Swiss-Prot record:
TM region positions: none
Domain of life: Bacteria
A Gene Ontology term for the protein's cellular component: cytosol
Disulphide-bonded residues: none
Any one Gene Ontology BP term: response to hydroperoxide
Species of the source: Lactobacillus johnsonii (strain CNCM I-12250 / La1 / NCC 533)
Family note: Belongs to the UPF0246 family.
Matching InterPro entries: YaaA
Protein name per Swiss-Prot or TrEMBL: UPF0246 protein LJ_0535
HAMAP family: UPF0246 (MF_00652)
Alphabetized NCBIfam families for the sequence: PRK02101.1-4
PANTHER family attached to this UniProt entry: PEROXIDE STRESS RESISTANCE PROTEIN YAAA, PEROXIDE STRESS RESPONSE PROTEIN YAAA
C-alpha cells in the first residue's frame, strides 16, 4: 500500500452533545456488539460503583446514570464528529467545513474511543462517559485495553499502512502495541518553550491537533510530509528535531 490513503487518529472528548440537525448519520460503528456489552455492564452498576468507575462528583454521576438507564445504541444518534465537543473538536470545526472536507474526514479520520473502540466521523453514536484508562472493576476485562485487544488496530490498518497520530498517549496505546514493521505511525508533537525547556501544553496541543485535522481536510492531504507545511498558532515544523516516526512542531 502507498501513503496515499493515510489515516489520522485523534482522541475523543469527555464533553459531548446531541446534535441531530446539522448532519445526517451516514454509518454505524464497526463494533456495536462490543459496545453493547459495555453498555449492558454499565447499566448493572450502582450509583457508588459508577462513582468509583467515573471518579466524578455526585451530580455528574447522577446525570450520567440517568442517561444510562434510557440509553440505546440505535436511537437519538449524533455523528461522532459533532458528538464530541471538547477543545480539539471546537478547533476542528467540522460543522463549517465544505463537503469535500467532510468527505475527506470520513475517509481519513478515525476517532479512538473507550466505549466504541474506533469511529468514523459520521458514525452515529450516543453520549457516554467511559475513558479508555478506566479501571473496569467488576467487569470480566479489568482493562479496556484488554477488552478491545487489537480490534481497533485491525480496523484502522485495513486499507492503509501509514497513520498520523494526533491522539494522546492514553488513546494511541490502543494501536501502538500491534504495529508491524511494514506499518508506520507518525506521532505529531507541538512544543513551546517554557523557562528554557521545550514542552507540550495539553490545552494548546488540543487546539493545534484540531487545527491540523482541519488543515488536512481543507488541503486534501494524502502524504505525511505535506503536513510539515502546517503553521497555525505560530507552530513551525522543526526538521532538526523530527524523525521518521515523530514530527516536531515548535512555537516560535
Amino acid at each position: 500500500m502507498s501513503d496515499n490513503n493515510i489515516k489520522i487518529i485523534i482522541a475523543p472528548a469527555k464533553k459531548m452533545r446531541v446534535d441531530q440537525d446539522t448532519f445526517l448519520v451516514k454509518s454505524e460503528p464497526a463494533f456495536l456488539d462490543k459496545t453493547q456489552e459495555l453498555l449492558d455492564f454499565l447499566k448493572t452498576r450502582s450509583f457508588n460503583q459508577l462513582q468509583d468507575l467515573w471518579k466524578a462528583n455526585d451530580n455528574i454521576v447522577r446525570t450520567n446514570q440517568h442517561n444510562l438507564v434510557t440509553s440505546e445504541l440505535d436511537s437519538n444518534l449524533t455523528p461522532a464528529l459533532l458528538a464530541f465537543s471538547g477543545i480539539q473538536y471546537q478547533y476542528l470545526a467540522g460543522d463549517v467545513l465544505p463537503q469535500e472536507g467532510l468527505d475527506y474526514l470520513q475517509d481519513h479520520l478515525r476517532i479512538l474511543s473507550g466505549f466504541y473502540g474506533i469511529l468514523r466521523p459520521f458514525d452515529g453514536i450516543i453520549p457516554y462517559r467511559l475513558e479508555l484508562k478506566t479501571q473496569m472493576t467488576g467487569f470480566k476485562y479489568y482493562s479496556l485495553y484488554n477488552f478491545w485487544k487489537d480490534l481497533p488496530y485491525q480496523e484502522l490498518f485495513a486499507d492503509t499502512d501509514t497513520v498520523i497520530n494526533l491522539a494522546s498517549l492514553e488513546y494511541s496505546r490502543l494501536i501502538s502495541p500491534y504495529l508491524k514493521d511494514s506499518q508506520k505511525m507518525i506521532t505529531i508533537k507541538f512544543l513551546e518553550n517554557k523557562n528554557g525547556k521545550w514542552r507540550q501544553s495539553a490545552t494548546h496541543a488540543k487546539m493545534a491537533r484540531g487545527e491540523m485535522v482541519r488543515f488536512a481536510a481543507k488541503e486534501g492531504i494524502n502524504r505525511p510530509e505535506d503536513l510539515k507545511e502546517f503553521s497555525d498558532f505560530g507552530y513551525v515544523f522543526s526538521a532538526a528535531d523530527s524523525t521518521k516516526e515523530n514530527y516536531i512542531f515548535k512555537k516560535l
